[in-house]
Amino acid sequence: MSRAHHAPERASILEIRGAALQRGDRELWSGLDLDVAPGEFLAVLGPSGSGKTTLLRSILGLQPLSAGSIRVDGRTAQRGDRRIGYVPQQRPLAPDTSMRARDLVALGVNGTRFGFPLPRRGDRERVDALLEGVGAAHYAERPVGLLSGGEQQRLRVGQALADDPALLLCDEPLSGLDLANQRAITGIIDRQRKQGAGVLFVTHDVNPILGLVDRILYIAGGRFVLGTPDEVLQSRVLTELYGTAVFVLRAGDRLVVVGAPDAEGTHAHEHSADESHPGAHA
């Protein structure tokens, strides 16, 4: 499999050193050293409960590490860091939610993502630009409760991009979306990567993004492996990681991981070896 692009050789936007995470009495994993460069796309894979989302929460300053350190753009990670954008899993808002699409995006622009807005000069122009950028300008005045899941997720991405973040954390952002919306959301995220943002993308299904991925962090059973997709998505590597037989199978243009204990779904790949992504670097 060929990679669509290569991460630029620049100082790390994310530095994790000697990190360990614990949930109650159970250690999720330990000894993680990770650098993410500007413009790098890192996929985080593994079964439910392996600590993928908890890792994102730690980077966001919401979950303390049990050991180690996290630095974002050279500074210790902390809650409310506006150098970080966060795209959550798509969860439909209640149909009676009356907030306009514009107002949801504005929460990322006006100085707070919670509580009352703090208007600033130029906010409306910035919101308009974000709505246009995520393809949501034509429903900016509609109540979000009346929008489809894909339309709502575009707004969440717009909110995450409000401060032009240097690091973009994505937690299962394609879950529950149809193929067209998966491609649209992935394209928006990749555009931010092309502008220099590092991307951490948690997913159970690597298929929609594998053509963009530079490296994979695969976490399972309190252990992890880090490398390129070609290095990680191998039967031998995943069998060693899980401690039981796991098979990476090719079926035409698809790559499927089977036999992984407690994994939700499979990882499929529809990117042929001689195919390049439409927005790939030369």
What is each residue range found by the language model?
Residues 120-139:
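Conserved ABC ATPase "signature" region
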Residues 234, 240-282:
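ABC ATPase nucleotide-binding domains
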Residues 60:
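Helix-to-loop junction immediately C-terminal to a conserved catalytic motif
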Residues 143-147, 151:
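Conserved ABC ATPase signature
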Residues 164:
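Conserved catalytic motifs of ABC-family nucleotide-binding domains
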